[in-house]
């Protein structure tokens, strides 16, 4: 095991502070509508130009191991806030820096860090409660668009497209972001249920020009196992042929004799049929097949449910007005499922979303929910160059997260003003003498986002903060984009409450941990030993004993 280097107390806190400042100073220049750009070198390809705090934070790695620990802890603040709320990463970094900077001065002066930590925790709890009181639900599409515009660094096109997407698919719909082929950023809404499995054979295609199989008013067979034997399928195919309706087969796999027979009958015109693989894997596949069955009013054919393929009749099949299948996707529109059954299924999935602890599972459950209720919207992001495309796509994803957060927990006035207004809740709070310092640190730190926004815009930060503080109007603040003092909610400068709350909670959590740190342990750098000088071919004597 390599030997370690350990530093204690003030020396440790100074190293952390230096790391925190290095990272935060690089990140905070991006804050606000007049935030500056940061250019990041890439080992290959062109450099990345960004105004996104978390992108800058993720790139920073410091040479000094102890300073790097401080930087990495603040990076954690940015990443966590981005994961939870999708935005507010720069604000969280600014808050963490301010809390730690002020706190470390007090600890250096001999105050008890544990009392300061308790004070910070109490203050943050009160401020979060006050932010929730200040919060208002998003009323209309316009407000949702404004949240998107701010999060996308002032890009109106992005904000409006996201608001339109949310209106079309509802707040539980799935909105995905893809790269477009052209320069335009467009919105495409898929009605009904779509899953990422295409036709098993191109011979099923009905529209040769677009390479799509369209089935109108079709039956749907939902089978969880492979179908390879034709004789199991024959009784059902005879019933389908008599009914004259198209059939879609969704199964784990359709292969061999069964697939060949379907293709031959399709080409002869005896049957109008198509087959696709079931979506998902393992247990998730079973759940998705159940979803399709409920949406279309059919039954999932599974032996464990006592249903065999040869016993299936038309009443066991699902129905849909229209089915469209291309080589990658299948879309089922207007399924014949009972409304009550679909609602019961939706309720079950919602309960699972509440219970799950895995982000991945939650995302997949959310997708299933959207397919049953709302639909799916795809935002195709267009740009002129690869670099611009990456940057724009990241902004769209940020804005999408922020608008979701706004719909979830409501909005507060933006531009760092909500924090200033929430500070009044700390007046008259009864705490011990040591904890009072923690309250004061939070009080000072909450001015920092507004100071930084004003500073980045080229305005005098102290004057701006004092002018905003003087007003009793909750929504009155400084609009750095125009340089005006106005009602921020009316002028569209708003932040999702979830973003403001998460930024403060994550920043205070990490700042408190760093304040109560007394020692840092890191591996000693290995001393590179100089390579021994090459000694030529000497030393080859003494070989005479060899036979």
From Swiss-Prot:
InterPro entries assigned to the protein according to its UniProt record, in alphabetical order: Chaperonin_Cpn60_CS, Cpn60/GroEL, Cpn60/GroEL/TCP-1, GroEL-like_apical_dom_sf, GROEL-like_equatorial_sf, TCP-1-like_intermed_sf
Reactions the enzyme catalyzes: ATP + H2O + a folded polypeptide = ADP + phosphate + an unfolded polypeptide
Region (Disordered): 526-547
Residues that bind ATP: 30-33, 51, 87-91, 415, 479-481, 495
Lyase keyword on record: no
Segments of skewed composition (Gly residues): 533-547
Subcellular location: Cytoplasm
Function comment: Together with its co-chaperonin GroES, plays an essential role in assisting protein folding. The GroEL-GroES system forms a nano-cage that allows encapsulation of the non-native substrate proteins and provides a physical environment optimized to promote and accelerate protein folding.
Self-association and partners: Forms a cylinder of 14 subunits composed of two heptameric rings stacked back-to-back. Interacts with the co-chaperonin GroES.
Protein name stated in the entry: Chaperonin GroEL 2
């Amino acid at each position: 095991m390599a030997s370690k280097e350990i530093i204690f107390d003030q020396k440790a806190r100074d190293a952390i502070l230096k790391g925190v400042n290095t990272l935060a100073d690089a990140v905070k220049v991006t804050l606000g509508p007049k935030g500056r750009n940061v250019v990041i070198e890439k080992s290959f390809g062109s450099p990345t130009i960004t105004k996104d705090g978390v992108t800058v934070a993720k790139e920073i790695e410091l040479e000094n191991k102890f300073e790097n620990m401080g930087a990495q802890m603040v990076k954690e603040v940015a990443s966590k806030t981005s994961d939870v709320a999708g935005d507010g990463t720069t604000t969280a970094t600014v808050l963490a820096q301010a809390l730690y900077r002020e706190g470390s001065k007090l600890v250096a002066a001999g105050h008890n860090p544990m009392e300061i930590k308790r004070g910070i925790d109490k203050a943050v709890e009160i401020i979060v409660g006050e932010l929730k009181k200040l919060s208002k639900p998003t009323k209309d599409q316009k407000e949702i668009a404004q949240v998107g515009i701010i999060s996308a660094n002032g890009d109106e096109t992005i904000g409006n497209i996201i608001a339109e997407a949310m209106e079309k698919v509802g707040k539980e719909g799935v909105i995905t972001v893809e790269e477009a082929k052209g320069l335009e950023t467009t919105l495409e809404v898929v009605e009904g249920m779509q899953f990422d499995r295409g036709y098993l054979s191109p011979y099923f295609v009905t529209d040769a020009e677009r390479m799509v199989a369209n089935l109108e008013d079709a039956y749907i067979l939902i089978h969880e196992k492979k179908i390879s034997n034709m004789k199991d399928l024959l009784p059902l195919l005879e019933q389908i042929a008599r009914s004259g309706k198209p059939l879609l087969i969704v199964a784990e796999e359709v292969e061999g004799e069964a697939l060949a027979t379907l293709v031959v009958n399709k080409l002869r015109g005896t049957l109008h049929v198509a087959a696709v693989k079931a979506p998902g894997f393992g247990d998730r596949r079973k759940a998705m097949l159940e979803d399709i069955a409920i949406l279309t009013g059919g039954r999932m054919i599974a032996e464990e449910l006592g249903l065999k393929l040869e016993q299936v009749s038309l009443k066991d099949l699902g129905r849909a007005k229209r089915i469209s299948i291309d080589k990658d996707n299948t879309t089922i529109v207007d399924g014949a499922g009972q409304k009550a059954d679909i609602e019961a299924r939706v309720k079950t999935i919602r309960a699972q979303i509440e219970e799950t602890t895995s982000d991945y599972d939650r995302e997949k459950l959310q997708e299933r929910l959207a397919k049953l209720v709302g639909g799916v919207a795809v935002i195709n992001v267009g740009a002129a160059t690869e670099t611009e495309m990456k940057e724009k796509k990241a902004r769209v994803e940020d804005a999408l997260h922020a608008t979701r957060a706004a719909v979830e927990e409501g909005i507060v006035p933006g531009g760092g003003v909500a924090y200033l207004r929430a500070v009044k809740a700390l007046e008259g709070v009864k705490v011990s003498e040591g904890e009072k310092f923690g309250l004061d640190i939070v009080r000072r730190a909450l001015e920092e986002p507004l100071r930084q926004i004003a500073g980045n815009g080229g305005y005098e930060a102290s004057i701006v903060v004092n002018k905003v503080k003087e007003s009793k109007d909750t929504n009155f603040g400084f609009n750095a984009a125009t340089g005006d003092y106005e009602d921020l909610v009316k002028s569209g400068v708003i932040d999702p409450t979830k973003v403001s709350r998460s930024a403060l909670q994550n920043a205070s959590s990490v700042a408190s941990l760093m304040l109560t740190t007394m020692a840092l342990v890191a591996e000693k750098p290995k001393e590179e030993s100089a390579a021994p000088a090459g000694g030529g071919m000497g030393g080859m004597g003494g070989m005479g004993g060899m036979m």
